[in-house]
Amino acid sequence: MPRHMFLYVDGAAAGNPGPAGAAAVLKDADGDTLLEKARAFGPATNNVAEYQALVLGLEMAAPLQPDILTVRTDSELMVRQLAGQYKVRAPNLKPLYRKVQRLLEPFKSVEIEHIQRGKNAEADRLAHKALQEARRVDAELPPTARRSGRGKKFRLK
């Protein structure tokens, strides 16, 4: 019987761009959680956070070598881009899209499904927990070291 696993991913950003969090929850076919991981980062947009969550999840699932991996996300944009229905136009998403394509290669079979936010509660909770950590770190920076402008890194004076 093939090993079927389910990967739930979610990303969140405050400020769009702003502090961000990404999370992934890997479950077996019985719905039992095998692994979960979250990461705080930023500045990032919501869409970047969603892709970062998928990267995190694929890296987490790869060593377990499932025969079938079903990815579930509430990001319709990401699902449609990965299905080839939408082009990836945003410059900040292109490298993440390419990275996801590379990470998908070793998997035998991958399905990517759009689900409603309520069905992604565990990944959503972890992503928001990571977002809170990113906000805390951002709040602890001195004002002169905080991010400056859209998509820029840090400016130190």
Which role does the model predict for each range below?
Residues 1-48, 52, 59-63, 67:
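RNase H-like nuclease fold core
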Residues 25, 88, 153-155:
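Intrinsically disordered, low-complexity, compositionally biased regions/tails
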Residues 9-16, 55-130:
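RNase H catalytic domain
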Residues 1-6, 34-35, 40, 62-65, ...:
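Intrinsically disordered, low-complexity regions
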Residues 31, 49, 95, 101, ...:
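Juxtamembrane helix-loop transition sites at the ends of transmembrane segments
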Residues 45, 90, 142-144:
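Alpha-helix initiation/capping motif
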